Amino acid sequence: GVLPLKNPEVSLFGATATSPVYGGTGSGAVNTADAPSYVDALTESGLTVTNTALLDWYREEEYGRDFSSSGEEINEAKWSAIQKSDAASTFGNGEVAVFVVGRVGGEANDLKSTNHVDGGYNPLGADVSANSDYLMLNKNELGILAGLKELKDAGKISGIVVLINSANPVSAAFLNDETYGIDAAVWIG
């Protein structure tokens, strides 16, 4: 298997890679002022994050979540937009791809498993939510995983790890779907 990582180089993907879920909402919220980023944590563990330019792109294009107003905001980029970004040359060089999925919920922000409005919140107006279940991956998230599988099949990345960053359960049927070629998953709560 791909874990433990033998290759010290990783690329991070997913809007949650730039805006980690550190806690819940309401009384489950935590002070994140001194909380490490994924890049900091991985670097301190002896790994090299090869695509920090993509993470900068996520921030510049306003992908990510605004946890303070609603827990149901999945604002993930489309794979086609990632490929067209200036940062596309910073990944696909034999490293392990780590796709970070995040879901937040808690007091005063209960997670609904149904009736999620297609499209969700997105300041850019893009269609970012294709299914009706916040606990499932949306079409953009699944599109990134499919794109990563294409890179893996072409020998451009050496593996795919999904990092589930949620204190709440997430529907994980996608993990065993061969469409996405996932080699390992870690739930970090």
Task: Kindly label every feature range from the protein language model.
Residues 1-189:
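C-terminal non-catalytic regions of proteins with extracellular/luminal or membrane-system context
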